Amino acid sequence: MFRLLLVSALVALSIGAVPKERSRRPLLDGRIVGGENADIEDFPYQLSLQHYGSHTCGASIISTTRAVTAAHCTDGSSTSSFTVRAGSSKREQGGQVVQVQEVNIHPDFDYWIIDYDVSVLRLPKLTFESGINAIALHPIGAELAVGTNGIISGWGTLASGGSLPDHLQVVEVPKVSDDYCQSAYGSITPRMTCHGYEEGGKDSCQGDSGGPNVAEGYLVGIVSWGRGCASAGYPGVYTKVADREIGKFIRSNL
């Protein structure tokens, strides 16, 4: 079955509302499947995006005052409802917690097909230290070779319908060809890139949405959507940071 990443559910729980299934696309459940515990000092760009104090998505630091996440993580919610936690391997304690000051969603974001799935967050100036630092953006027009591993991190659930882990998780998954991803889903746009194993078993999947996909020292993708969780034949789909429209939008909001 298509997964809904539990973003709507997590947000609803934090405000006591019943979530509506608005999306035609299967949003990634945002969990790390087949991964292991990670130390924030090894992934200092990782943020927990919190909605009324509860973890709802991942995000990535790209400067002292900017972070990026998925548009579907912030769509429909007020800026004042969001904070981020930086510099902690634990999603509920430690590090720096700051109020999000501004949310800039890509103007062409399409919730129904999950295209242009990127938001830039403006933050108070973060103090870079051990466990808090920026990740470089993949250059516009750059291409990652098929088979190159992407490093996915976050606090998403470890099993379908399970509770969120307290400790940061990480997994590596290889890039697959656009043709393979197109054959799996039938409708992949140039703003999307796909990673996964043909046999399944490892994946991003409830709470990791908006989080980083890092390869060769660059932020190459943003956790976006997919079918199932680590399901054979269905790679995870990520917003492609090197796409010209995505890359220009992010840089125009720095």
Regions flagged by a language model, labelled:
Residues 2-13, 17-18, 61-72, 82-83, ...:
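C-terminal subregion of chymotrypsin/trypsin-like serine protease catalytic domains
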Residues 49-53, 62-64, 70-73, 86-88, ...:
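Active-site-proximal beta-strand/loop segments in catalytic clefts of secreted hydrolases
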Residues 38-42, 61, 76-78, 92, ...:
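Extracellular/periplasmic catalytic domains that process cell-envelope and extracellular macromolecules
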Residues 37-39, 50-52, 109-113, 163, ...:
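Short Gly/Pro-enriched turn/cap motifs at secondary-structure boundaries
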Residues 19-21, 98, 103, 118-124, ...:
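Chymotrypsin/trypsin-fold serine protease catalytic domain
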Residues 29-30, 49, 67-70, 75-111, ...:
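Conserved H-D interstitial segment of serine endopeptidase catalytic domains
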Residues 72-77, 87-92, 124-129, 156-160, ...:
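Acidic glycine-/aspartate-rich tracts in secreted/extracellular proteins
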Residues 1-68, 81-88, 193:
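Protease-domain processing segments flanking chymotrypsin-fold serine proteases, especially trypsin-like
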